[in-house]
From Swiss-Prot:
Residues 126-155, 706-722, 749-778, 1605-1618 have a biased composition (Polar residues). GO terms for cellular component: Swr1 complex. Residues 335-409 form the HSA domain. PANTHER family: HELICASE SRCAP, HELICASE SRCAP-RELATED. This is Helicase SWR1. Catalytic component of the SWR1 complex which mediates the ATP-dependent exchange of histone H2A for the H2A variant HZT1 leading to transcriptional regulation of selected genes by chromatin remodeling. It holds the Pfam family SNF2-rel_dom. The gene is SWR1. Keywords: Activator, ATP-binding, Chromatin regulator, DNA-binding, Helicase, Hydrolase, Nucleotide-binding, Nucleus, Transcription, Transcription regulation.
Length: 1691
């Protein structure tokens, strides 16, 4: 029978720690097997070294009481050297970081760490030690064998086996047995069939020296012990010659996991019954099923209770008198010692202090003497050493020290010099980079301008976007994107026209698609040809035929296709070479007078290319083109091609601009094919009519500004010199445009010679400011044009787009133009912005566009219209009014309502247009994204001005075919918002195409934007103005902006007034007090954006009304429960009793004895006689006599010894007492009945005159005497002596005004001490009389009891703020009161806008106080109620005011019933205020509109107004002056169009004219004063120039807030920024070469004849060469550094 394994049977006494090592290894294997593997790799194999051996002949070489050596050898044999090093496997992620096994142990009462102490003590016997057969006789000296878990082993040199590193697969785990069997019998080791195969032992590696690290030596002892354990376990198996292969399997865990509840051993029962359980469970822990809890502590036994009782009794005994804890003996009862007052200083104290101070002075003097003596000694020593003769070594050391110090100084200086050189080189590199970046930005901007101009000209010529392919300058677009756009348009067209198989448009489209592949192959073939080959190929272009008007539109023939291809190829060449017929702004061309010969050759090639075609080739024949070009070349030199807008742009060749500076502006999808036929037809008709006009008529027509064609509006004005001839079409419109005829011959003569300046701007009004780049050359023309601004609109010409038959109503002329423009956008597959001013009918034009799509293109939808919540119903009503044929879905309501409306969402027949709000789009964005929309229209598109907002990002991802933005304010704050709108229209698809990048866009226009915001529009230099002009050209294809003053000449005028309001006294105190607070100053200086905004909002609240900042409190008095005087009540009563209590036996009451006759005058004689008659004197006398008899008969003798005598004596005393009472009553009754008056009350009242009540006769009680009483009453006497109620009424106003100071404290019991008891009774009686209810009848109004003191009493007890203080506390309300009274007297009605909702509440109180009728609209107003309120206000003239919120109530509401707009406060965004004022100044308004702005002077509101003016100025320059109108090019002649291409010096200006223009200014009126100022700067002193600049800035800063439009004449002295180009400032020394003083330069040459340079040049060259390939550190953007946590990614 095998014995159970134990520590005694397995290990010898000499190895007690081996069990611990084995246990750690087993636990490591349970945790994943990596610990054991790590042990075998790290300890047995020693990190790849030869296997370690053991020597059992020396079993006691390790001692437990000695510390092992650091480099101790644990094996007899030397491990081999050439064994490859094996890497330790990486720990798996599921393995715990904690150490396997205990990390500390306790030895002899001391805790030791197991990591640094390698010898562990002998652990306790293993409770779960595994048993093995043949475990006896383990103490053997035979060779051992180490068995691994995988069964693979090999013999060591001494007979042991080592695991093969090649086999690492773990064996399968043996099936687990039940817990019962596991506990009863030992576990037997099982081996698999795979492990029973014989394997030849691996030959041992060659011997090698050990190369292991010190780290493995720490675990050598554990390895030896592990080997000893294995040796003892396999001793019996090694008795034979051949040791069998035995595989030991170790379980993953010490216990079998439980997989079923039945495997859990049930806890044995404690006791047979509950009583038995209660008896036993007290000592058993809760964990084992008992009742003993560990936190309860030991059981409270009788002994413990007895001990505690003895302690308590002892304490009680000691507390008694005489005990240890008594009050007399215990120290705790002693009073705390009182602090003694400090002792007063005496003479002794002053003496001690003086002595201490003197001691300190003596010690300090002694220290100074010692230091001085030491210094003298050292000086003497140094002097003695100096006088001694020096040896050579000392001299050498001194010289060495001197040279070392000099070397350090030189090295430091040289190092600083090289650092300065490095800084200078980096500065130059940075400057070069900035110049290169500017060139790149300008080249990209020029490319964008060229693309926009090409698109405009292509649209104007009627070719739409067919002429603009990838070769027309859009090199930045990839071929894949173009093909994808073609496919997308083809699919869309196919979907729209599935049911129209016989339609001509669909036929054209299909034919276009079929020939697309052939055209692509042809284009690919043309790409490989040179210019000469292309000229030869397309030399003979057939002329366009003259089709008749009855000819139907047919499919394009291959001949037409070749013509189109030819035009495309020619347009490509012209675009690349900056042809004058295509480019209106050639910034990419040569700008230097010193152009190379290559530029001249390119220009000659361009002239020859013009013969081939271009955009003019589609309108004219080859002969006409050659004639026109020859005339232009004859008049214009070839070398005069300069850029007149950007003189500082360096020359960049077209090839470089195309390759290096590519810029992706917008993606140009192909147009719909069915439009091409109509456009070609219109083009042919235009050419036909043009050819029929005689040449003489053409010359005359060329000079007229108002002449235009009917169909395609092709203008051909020519100058009198016939130097230029080309078409002047409007690239703005794809359809026919409106022309304005001259109103008078004096204004626009028929033979007006062309000038070099731009055309005149629209009429200058309060809304439109003339652009400084496009103003007239003479002031007379501008005046005449301004005088005709109120004239009726001209008669419209024939429009290309007919009014859809679905539209109900008549469109105005400008609305027809807008419809043409929108239809042209759709035809070109271009998205746009309709930015007409508020009130011009953007809604109607949008509805007309959708109706046009349904009628012409048969596209009924689905369309998505996203509008603000306030105008949803307005849009629905407009659709039903103007286009009832559309099915409208108003998508709003609760979640259930919206879900019900989405039923049949994907069915196109249920509805055509979906109208919803921005909020609902964000809430249900997943539903909207799944639907494919044809047209997405955004009303009030400035809601998506922030590209970082969720609204912008959500709407950007919608699946739409076309997009249209409606906004009255395309530019509100900055150009970033404008970029957000443009990129939303033209997003990039898969990172390709789309509008320009935000950073690129900012680089283009950062300079003019900063100049406008900082210095105003008048301070812009020429470069900034040129950039603004190019911005206009970039925006013109996508933006249509008309003003009311431009399109509607009968619009009423609009006047703006700024009312400055003084702060009230309370406002000024709150305003100054808030600013003077310390925390406010710290917040404003901290730079925290949110905190600063919060402070500014508080200041704005004070300016609007002080109640928004601090409410006026309700003042009440503090009520005391008990007054101070009441504490002396008892004392007062006692004193009064002692001093005033009379003695009844000393004083005689004369009134009681009837000795005062006048005391009874209050009784009448009748009453006195009746009292005498009712006297009961006789009855009282009888009772007295009867009581006397009873008293005398009572027992009178007293015998104290008997009870009867005592009782009888007491009864006798009581009887005599009653007798005395009856006798006293008889006495009193006799005196009282004898009281009689001398005259009596009735006689006194009869004889009393009553002078105090004489003026008022009492009202007679007889009715017939009442009339006589009224007649005898005197009103004069009544007015002279008023009653109490009349007096109270007269003082009521004074009491209400001046009874405003409540007492600080009031009490309840003060009246009785002040008035006394009688006074309180008198007032109480009077109060009861006053509070008596007044009789009233049902038909009479109720009357309050007449209480004359009620008003004063209430006002002195509680103080409510006077409602009139609401107005007097605020300066704005005072001005508003006067303004409303003035408006009401004049019959005007007003809209009052404010930004804050709480201000609306105050305005309501204000209007209620004054009794004005008003309506209110804010964000809380429901959508259904907004239209009702709007209609009510417009139809009810009795309503004076309509108060609205700027943010909620000002959008999309038509309030033409009012003619006055009052802005109570300024919005941060001036565009919001402009939208609000346009709600009444719009089409339909018949009266002039006055706008009043209430601004608190000397406050933050003045600064807000100034900032708003700056933002409005930026909008005027970027948007208003751009003239984004349909008739923009109608006012331009050919000369104006090509003025940017002409060189000023090519017009015959010589050097004298240039010098004269330099001093007095040239023909350009915008720059004359700037040039004069520059010339004056050169003549004046530097100090005078600097002072003039400062003064001019101050003047312009003051004028910027009051002037509406810029003045043509600038100040006398101009600034360098204004007139001097970069690098030409006088203060910077940048003079011209002519004006600079001539200094003769002396050149030096070296021996080789080369020019000698300075050392600085050499150092700069060396450093530049070294830093040539290093990274240049660019300056950090300060704005980005402040964006903490914000998104700064590029979009």
């Amino acid at each position: 029978m095998p014995e159970t394994a134990s520590t005694a049977n397995v290990l010898p006494k000499s190895d007690p720690d081996a069990i611990k090592t084995e246990q750690d290894a087993l636990e490591g294997y349970e945790n994943g097997g990596d610990a054991l593997q790590g042990t075998m790799d790290g300890h047995v194999e020693t990190n790849g070294d030869a296997p370690a051996t053991e020597n059992h002949h020396e079993p006691n070489h390790i001692h437990d009481d000695e510390r092992p050596a650091k480099r101790r050898r644990t094996r007899d044999s030397t491990p081999p050297q050439n064994t490859p090093k094996k890497m330790k496997p990486v720990s798996p992620p599921w393995k715990k970081i904690s150490a396997d096994g205990p990390t500390s142990y306790t030895e002899n009462g001391r805790r030791k760490s197991g990591r640094i102490n390698t010898l562990l003590p002998e652990p306790s016997p293993l409770s779960k030690s595994r048993t093995s057969k043949r475990s006896t006789g383990a103490n053997s000296n035979t060779k051992t064998e180490i068995h691994l878990t995988n069964g693979n082993s090999r013999k060591m040199p001494n007979g042991s086996h080592k695991a093969s590193p090649a086999t690492k697969a773990p064996s399968k785990q043996a099936p687990a047995s039940t817990p019962k069997s596991a506990s009863k019998k030992p576990t037997e080791t099982r081996t698999s069939s795979r492990s029973t195969r014989r394997r030849s032992p691996t030959p041992p590696p060659p011997p090698k020296n050990s190369t292991r690290s010190r780290r493995s030596a720490r675990f050598s002892d554990a390895v030896i012990k592990d080997e000893a354990v294995q040796d003892s376990r396999t001793a019996t198996s090694n008795s034979t010659n051949r040791s069998p292969r035995i595989k030991l399997r170790v379980g993953r865990s010490g216990h079998i996991p439980l997989v079923h509840p039945g495997q859990v051993r049930k806890r044995p029962k404690i006791g047979t019954s509950f009583e038995d359980f209660w008896t036993r469970a007290g000592d058993i822990p809760v964990e084992e099923g008992g009742l003993q809890a560990s936190e309860d502590g030991p059981q409270y036994t009788d002994e413990l209770a007895e001990r505690d009782a003895r302690v308590i009794l002892r304490v009680e005994k000691e507390v008694e008198d005489g005990g240890m804890l008594s009050q007399g003996r215990c120290s705790i009862f002693l009073p705390e010692p009182a602090e003694e007052p400090p002792r007063q200083w005496a003479r002794q104290d002053h003496m001690v202090k003086a002595m201490t101070n003197f001691r300190k002075l003596m010690l300090a003097e002694q220290q100074r003497h010692r230091i001085a003596a030491k210094k003298v000694a050292e000086a003497c020593r140094d002097e003695w050493l100096r006088r001694q003769p020096k040896s050579e070594e000392e001299i050498e050391a001194e010289q060495r020290a001197v040279w070392i110090s000099r070397y350090r100084i030189v090295a430091k200086t040289l190092f600083g010099t090289w650092e300065n050189v490095r800084t200078e080189v980096n500065r130059r590199r940075l400057a070069e980079w900035e110049q290169e970046e500017q060139r790149r930005v300008k080249a990209a901007l020029n490319e964008a301008v060229n693309l926009s101009e090409q698109k405009l000209q292509a649209r104007q010529a009627g070719l739409d976007s067919e002429q603009l392919s990838e070769e027309d300058g859009f090199d930045d677009l990839s071929d894949d994107m173009s093909m994808a756009d073609d496919d997308e348009l083809g699919l869309a067209s196919g979907e729209d026209e599935d049911d129209e198989d016989g339609d001509a448009d669909s036929d054209i489209m299909s034919s276009d698609e079929e020939e697309g592949d052939e055209e692509d192959q042809k284009d690919i073939g043309d790409e490989n040809l040179t210019q000469e080959q292309l000229r030869a190929k397309y030399a003979h272009i057939p002329e366009l035929e003259k089709p008749s008007t009855e000819t139907p539109v047919t499919e394009p023939t291959p001949k037409d296709t070749d013509a189109v291809d030819t035009a495309q190829a020619t347009a490509t060449e012209n675009a690349e070479t900056s042809d004058e017929s295509v480019d209106m702004d050639d910034d990419m061309g040569s700008t230097d007078m010193d152009s190379d010969e290559e530029d001249e050759e390119e220009e000659s090639e361009e002239e020859s290319d013009e013969d081939a075609g271009g955009l003019l080739g589609l309108l004219f024949g080859k002969s006409e083109l050659k004639k026109m070009n020859s005339e232009a070349v004859a008049e214009t030199p070839a070398d005069s091609k300069e850029d007149s807008e950007m003189p500082d742009v360096e020359a960049v060749s077209d090839g470089e601009g195309a390759e290096e500076n590519e810029m992706s502006l917008i993606q140009m999808p192909d147009p719909e094919p069915h439009e091409s036929g109509a456009l070609e037809k219109s083009t042919k008709e235009a050419v036909e009519e043009k050819e029929q006009i005689p040449a003489a008529m053409q010359d005359v027509a060329a000079g007229q500004d108002g002449l235009s064609n009917t169909d395609n509006n092709v203008q051909e004005p020519a100058s009198q010199d016939n130097d230029v001839a080309m078409t002047g079409n409007d690239p703005e419109e794809p359809s026919a445009l409106t022309f304005e005829k001259p109103h008078s011959p004096a204004t626009e003569p028929a033979t007006n010679p062309p000038s070099r300046v731009h055309s005149t701007s629209p009429p200058a009004t309060s809304e439109t400011k003339p652009s400084e780049l496009d103003t007239a050359s003479t002031e007379e023309m501008a005046v005449d044009k301004h005088d005709t601004s109120r004239s009726p609109s001209p008669q419209p010409s024939n429009h290309k787009i007919e009014v859809p038959f679905l539209l109900r109503g008549t469109l105005r002329e400008y609305q027809r133009d807008g419809l043409d423009w929108l239809a042209g956008l759709y035809a070109n597959s271009t998205n746009g912005i309709l930015a007409d001013e508020m009130g011009l009918g953007k809604t109607i034009q949008t509805i007309a566009l959708l109706a046009h799509l349904a009628c012409t293109h048969e596209v009924w939808g689905p369309h998505l219209v996203i509008v603000p919540t306030s105008v949803m119903l307005n849009w629905e009503m407009e659709f039903k009014k103007w286009c009832p044929g559309f099915k409208i879905l108003a998508y709003y309501g609760s979640q259930e309502e919206r879900k019900r409306k989405r039923q049949g969402w994907n069915n196109d027949d249920i509805w055509n247009v979906c109208i919803t709000s921005y909020q609902l789009v964000l809430q249900d964005q997943q539903v909207f994204k799944r639907r494919r929309w044809h047209y997405m229209i955004l009303d009030e598109a400035h809601n998506i001005k922030n590209f970082k907002s969720q609204r912008w990002q959500t709407l950007l991802g919608f699946n739409t075919q076309a997009r249209l933005l409606l906004t009255g304010t395309p530019l509100q704050n900055n150009l970033t918002e404008l970029w957000s709108l443009l990129f939303f229209l033209m997003p990039a698809e898969n990172g390709v195409g789309g509008f320009a990048d935000l950073q690129e866009f900012h680089d283009w226009f950062a300079k003019p934007e900063s100049q406008i915001l900082e210095s105003g529009r008048e301070q812009m230099d020429d470069e900034a103005r040129a950039i603004i002009s190019k911005l206009h050209k970039v925006l013109r294809p996508y933006l249509l902006r008309r003003l009311k003053a431009d399109v509607e000449k009968q619009m009423p005028a609009k006047y703006e007034h700024v009312e400055f309001c003084r702060l009230s006294k309370r406002q000024r105190e709150l305003y100054d007090g808030f600013l003077s607070r310390t925390d406010t100053k710290e917040t404003l200086n901290s730079g925290n954006y949110l905190s600063i905004i919060n402070c500014l909002m508080q200041l704005r609240k004070v300016c609007n009304h002080p109640d928004l900042f601090v409410d006026r409190p309700i003042m009440t008095s503090f009520r005391m429960q008990k007054s101070v005087v009441s504490d002396f009540e008892v004392t007062e009563q006692r004193v009064q009793r002692l001093l005033h209590d009379p003695s009844p036996m000393k004083d005689v009451s004369l009134g009681f004895l009837n000795l005062m006759p006048t005391q009874c005058e209050s009784l009448s004689t009748t009453q006195a006689e009746r009292i005498s008659q009712l006297s009961s004197h006789r009855k009282l006398m009888e009772l007295r006599e009867a009581q006397k008899i009873r008293a005398q008969s009572a027992h009178a003798n007293l015998d104290p010894s008997t009870v009867a005598s005592n009782i009888g004596y007491l009864e006798s005393g009581a009887r005599w007492g009653r007798y005395e009472e009856l006798q006293h009553c008889v006495y009193l009754n006799a005196l009282r009945r004898q009281k009689k008056p001398i005259y009596g009350k009735n006689l006194i009242e009869l004889l009393t005159i009553g002078t105090d009540k004489r003026p008022y006769k009492p009202r007679p009680k007889i009715p017939r005497q009442v009339l006589a009483w009224f007649e005898e009453e005197s009103t004069l006497v009544q007015s002279m002596i008023p009653t109490v109620n009349q007096r109270a009424d007269s003082f009521k106003t004074i009491i209400e005004k001046f009874s405003c100071v409540t007492p600080a404290v009031v009490t309840r019991d003060m009246e009785q001490f002040v008035l006394g008891r009688k006074g309180i009774e008198a007032f109480s009686d009077e109060d009861l009389k006053l509070s008596a209810p007044v009789r009233w009848a049902p038909f009479l109004p109720k009357e309050a009891p007449p209480d004359p003191w009620h008003e004063g009493r209430m006002r002195l007890s509680i103080q409510f703020p006077d409602k009139r203080l609401l107005q007097y506390d605020c300066g704005k309300l005072q001005i508003l009161d006067k303004l409303l009274r003035k408006l009401q007297a004049g019959g005007h009605r007003a809209l009052i806008f404010t930004q804050m909702t709480k201000v609306l509440d105050i305005l309501e109180q204000f209007l209620n106080i004054h009794g004005h009728k008003y309506l209110r609209l804010d964000g809380a107003t429901k959508v259904e109620q907004r239209q009702i309120l709007t209609d009510r206000f417009n139809n009810d003239p009795r309503i004076l005011c309509f108060i609205l919120s700027t943010r909620s109530g000002g959008l999309g509401i038509n309030l033409t019933g009012a003619d006055t707009v009052i802005f109570y406060d300024q919005d941060w965004n001036p565009a919001m205020d402009k939208q609000c004022q346009d709600r009444c100044h719009r089409i339909g308004q018949t009266r002039d509109v006055h706008i009043y702005r209430l601004v608190s002077e000397h406050t933050i509101e003045a600064n807000i107004l100034r900032k708003a003016s700056q933002k409005q100025m930026l909008d005027d320059v970027v948007i208003q002056e751009g003239e984004f109108t349909t008739d923009y090019f109608n006012k331009l002649s050919v000369r104006d169009v090509l003025s940017e291409k002409l060189d000023s010096k090519s017009e015959g200006l010589d050097a004298a004219d240039a010098a004269l223009d330099r001093v007095l200014g040239g023909p350009d009126t915008n720059n004359d004063q700037r040039r004069v100022g520059r010339a004056l700067e050169q003549a004046e002193d530097r100090e005078d120039v600097a002072a003039a600049r400062v003064a001019e800035k101050e003047i312009q800063a003051d004028d910027a807030d009051f002037t509406e439009k810029p003045s043509n004449n600038a100040s006398g002295t101009s600034t360098a920024r204004q007139g001097t180009p970069a690098g030409k400032s006088v203060l910077d020394g940048g003079l011209d070469d002519i004006d600079a003083p001539h200094v003769e330069e002396v050149l030096e040459y070296n021996a080789w004849g080369d020019k000698m340079h300075t050392i600085d040049d050499y150092m700069l060259g060396i450093m530049a060469e070294q830093l040539k390939d290093t990274k240049l550190e660019l300056p950090k953007d300060k704005k980005k550094g402040k964006k903490k946590g914000k998104d700064t990614r590029k979009r």
